[in-house]
Amino acid sequence: YKKADETRRKFHLLLWNVYNFFITYANVDGWDSKMQNEKLKMKNENVLDKWILSKLNQLIATVTSSLEKYDAMAASLAIEAFVTDLSQWYIRRSRDRVGPTVDASLDKDACYKTLYEVLVVLCKLLAPFTPFLAEEIYRNLTGGESVHLESWPVAENNMINKDIERQMDLA
């Protein structure tokens, strides 16, 4: 039971808190991914957004490669490390970019867009490991039928930026 409780505390609750942060502030601000089509195409200039999107694409590549080798442990550990970075680095440093006290801006929209994209893709990667949690978050975010009916994500190598990742590792 101790291992299960530790996993719940260190991973499931952390992921749920990231999701809760996003939906709370996005709802308060009236942000809706379906209404953001033009804004979603904007070039993202924020280094935090570039960093987490780089990490996300690296995660897609790592999880895909690990699962192709039937190494579920390596894949799950990579996801766990990513969720920790997402919570302890991206969310903590992006808190002042969102919320009702922050004026509407492209940076605010970029933060919501980035977090939305990260959570949707993360649900697809999580589906083989935590199917019910991934389904709950995915359906609440997208309104889609099921995360299990979606295509597996493909890493966009042009989004992987090792320089930004190195700089963040030094921070």
Question: Predicted segment positions?
Answer:
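Acidic, turn-prone loop/beta-hairpin segments
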Residues: H12, D29-Q36, K43-T64, R92-A171
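Feature marking long nucleic-acid-engaging regions of large polymerase/nuclease enzymes
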Residues: K2-K3, T7, N20-F21, N27
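Conserved phosphate-binding loops in nucleotide/dinucleotide-binding enzymes
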Residues: Y1-K10, E68-K69, M73-A75, N158-M168
